[in-house]
A protein has these predicted regions:
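Glycine-rich flavin
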Residues: 2-7, 17, 23-174, 207-211, ...
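Flexible, glycine-rich terminal cap/loop adjacent to redox cofactors
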Residues: 10-21, 26-38, 44, 51, ...
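Short hydrophobic core segments
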Residues: 10-12, 117, 136-146, 181, ...
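Glycine-rich Rossmann-fold phosphate-binding loop(s) that bind the pyrophosphate
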Residues: 13-16, 181-184, 313
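Glycine-rich dinucleotide-binding loop and its adjacent helix/turn
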Residues: 50, 145-200, 204, 232, ...
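Short, acidic, Ser/Thr-enriched surface-loop or helix-capping motifs
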Residues: 114, 290, 298-299, 364, ...
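FAD-site-proximal beta/loop scaffold in flavoenzymes
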Residues: 158-175, 261-335
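Active-site substrate-recognition segment that forms the wall
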Residues: 186-207, 231, 302-309, 315, ...
């Protein structure tokens, strides 16, 4: 059965970027259609990404904390895991959140069309759904088509023992020996989960550190911890993958490469994601898509076709849900007639591992590359009463200041719940705060949060919780 719908705005894709754009359009009084290929809203993030991974990481954290407490006199015994119940818990979290989105769409009178949408012209999209074909004609469009995992031609991806992130999140089994290709955030988060559930985990990364975007001093602290969980093979890459009846055999080359192919029960390919710009027939609407699948936009999220905007993963790095949400708001507001722009000072990044790795603003290597006259100040959690009492004293808080203006331009945290502490640094950068503003703000004690204020005190030379390198020298 074929039907037609007319809308002021159509949003293609209902991930965080897409549903935020659609809901904002509706709130601004625009008749809005939201197209989604899944049966539920939320896209990759809610269904097979950010949210289910955090549910599983919560389980992993509880398991690891229970084991660690034995050293402090609280013995629970060896944790017994029921994979089916863990999976049900993860699915319950997804259902609760996607159901909530569905309810908000109805409340806002957003017309949700389920199926795969492709452009047929500059003002039309055809959606192929289980109930037939729907043609949506529109005045304005917002593309939020997202991204998908990268696949390599020499890997037999059709073998069920070769996983991408979606497969890993299904939690069908816990392999005895797991290889993770890629030392980025997704791979390390999944490695954290499967290690806690009992897998022997190897991680292969072609660069000289995991999470290559983060600064080396932060990753040095992180690596010291995770090396106890994973076998890290840095400066090493996979050259061949062969599926055999008794396992997946992987050949490698580089600094840590085994001499012979290594057998694994499963291999998680987590080497990044590719945008879906080439999968929506954008060219039929006159939209320019580059050879990688990205759609380029201006600061109002407009494509080269003025009434069509694009947001989220499909417009470029970083591929982060929170970036897409803000882009979605801008696109909706521009369509409604507001003169808004996407020009963020900060976009935070977080690896929800244990310990967490989080950074915002400029990294030290970025500041150096840009020729900024900067100074780094750090506060080691080994000097934090709360960190010591909470058994996480191996963390660190790092702040980067402009030496000329004393303004904070970046910051990073490695440690338990580091991502939850990052907000103050992001706000300080966005508001143009200097070191004195942060140092003179009274932070509660004892908290991990106060490490941010103490790092600012290090820069200011007013620190009393550490030896003060900037103290006035006195004659004996």
């Amino acid at each position: 059965m074929s039907k037609e719908i007319k809308a002021q705005v159509v949003v293609l894709g209902s991930g965080p970027a897409g549903y935020s754009a659609a809901f904002r359009c509706a709130d601004l009084g625009l008749d809005t259609v939201l197209i989604e290929k899944y049966n539920t809203l939320g896209g990759v993030c809610l269904n097979v990404g950010c949210i289910p991974s955090k549910a599983l990481l919560h389980v992993a954290k509880v398991i690891e904390e229970a084991k660690a407490m034995a050293e402090h006199g609280v013995i629970f015994g060896e944790p017994q895991t029921d994979i089916n119940k863990i999976r049900l818990w993860k699915d319950k979290v997804i259902t609760q959140l996607t159901g909530g989105l569905g309810g908000m769409a109805k409340m806002r009178k957003v017309n949700v069309v389920n199926g795969y949408g492709k452009f047929t012209g500059p003002n039309s999209i055809v959606v192929e759904g289980v109930d037939g074909q729907t043609t949506v004609t529109f005045d304005n469009a917002i593309i939020a088509a997202g991204s998908r995992p990268i696949k390599l031609p020499f890997i037999p991806h059709e073998d069920p023992r070769i996983w991408d992130s979606t497969d890993a999140l299904e939690l069908k089994e816990v392999p005895e020996k797991l290889l993770i290709m890629g030392g980025g955030i997704i791979g390390l988060e999944m490695g954290t989960v499967y290690h806690a559930l009992g897998s022997d985990v190897d991680v292969v990364e072609m660069f000289d550190q995991v999470i290559p975007a983060a600064d080396k001093d932060i990753i040095k602290v992180f690596t010291k911890r995770i090396s106890k969980k994973f076998n890290l093979m840095l400066e090493t890459k996979v050259t061949a993958v062969e599926a055999k009846e008794d396992g997946i055999y992987v050949s490698m080359e580089g600094k840590k490469a085994p001499a012979e192919p290594t057998r694994y029960d499963a291999v998680l390919v987590a080497i990044g994601r590719v945008p879906n710009g080439q999968l929506i027939d954008a060219e039929k609407a006159g939209i320019n898509v580059d050879e990688r699948g990205f759609i380029h936009v201006d600061k109002q999220m407009r494509t080269n076709v003025a009434h069509i905007h694009a947001i989220g993963d499909v417009v470029g790095q970083p591929m982060l849900a929170h970036k897409g949400v803000h882009e979605g708001h801008v696109a909706a507001e521009v369509i409604s007639g507001k003169k808004h722009y996407f020009d963020p000072k900060v976009i935070p990044s977080i690896a929800y591992t244990e310990p967490e790795v989080a950074w915002v603003g400029k990294t030290e290597k970025e500041a150096k590359a840009e020729g900024i006259n900067y100074e780094v100040s750090t506060f080691p959690w080994a000097a934090s009463g709360r960190a010591i009492a909470s058994d996480c004293a191996d963390g660190m808080t790092k702040m980067i200041f402009d030496k000329d203006t004393h303004r904070v331009i970046g910051g990073a945290i490695v440690g338990t719940n580091g991502g939850e502490l990052l907000g103050e640094i992001g706000l300080a950068i966005a508001m143009g705060c200097d070191a004195e503003d942060i140092a003179l703000t009274i932070h509660a004690h004892p908290t991990l949060h106060e490490s941010i204020g103490l790092a600012a005190e290090v820069f200011e030379g007013s620190i009393t919780d550490l030896p003060n390198a900037k103290a006035v020298k006195r004659n004996k």
